[in-house]
Amino acid sequence: MKIGIVTGIPGVGKSTVLAKVKEILDNQGINNKIINYGDFMLATALKLGYAKDRDEMRKLSVEKQKKLQIDAAKGIAEEARAGGEGYLFIDTHAVIRTPSGYLPGLPSYVITEINPSVIFLLEADPKIILSRQKRDTTRNRNDYSDESVILETINFARYAATASAVLAGSTVKVIVNVEGDPSIAANEIIRSMK
């Protein structure tokens, strides 16, 4: 499967846009799969007793997060190899804000295992992201609860995605998630993968 990694800060709308990507490709009869990187990491974290949920997982030591990243990359690469023709999209983050600094979400040991065609940076105005975060009561994102922190994280994500693309030989594409119409970003992602 051709792989696209869709990154973005928590609250930017990755899951919503990727659901729209899936809907569009399904309607076109194109084989596709959406994988959430955090789901793979969380399954291992739960099994090892590292964390009880995603928000707790973000606060783990860098060493533990690296182990979880490696295990997830191997599992996702295997799914891509077994998937046949079509598209595999990975919902993840280019950087993770931790108590000890920004942890690259796609370091060399992850990006070379997955080997994507495109790394997408899904972005939106920090005010819009903050508003979306406040509406999502299912998550605890108080570590991203300030516009300046959101902007800083977006900038670090751009740097990290570019560095990862160099290692994988993939392209990087910034896509704006327009408020109220995720199909605009979804169609742009699909066009970039063809």
From Swiss-Prot:
Keywords, sorted A to Z: ATP-binding, Cytoplasm, Kinase, Nucleotide-binding, Transferase
EC code: 2.7.4.3
**UniProt-annotated location(s):** Cytoplasm
Q: InterPro entries of this UniProt entry?
A: Adenylate_kinase_AdkA (IPR023477), P-loop_NTPase (IPR027417)
Q: Which GO terms describe its molecular function?
A: adenylate kinase activity; ATP binding
Give the reactions, separated by semicolons, that this protein catalyses: AMP + ATP = 2 ADP
The primary location reported for this protein is: cytoplasm
Residues annotated as binding ATP:
G8, I9, P10, G11, V12, G13, K14, S15, T16
Per UniProt, what is one Pfam family of this protein? AAA_17
Pull one GO CC term from this UniProt entry.
cytoplasm
Q: Does the keyword Transmembrane apply?
A: no
Question: What SUPFAM superfamilies does its record include?
Answer: P-loop containing nucleoside triphosphate hydrolases
Query: What is this protein's record name?
Result: Adenylate kinase
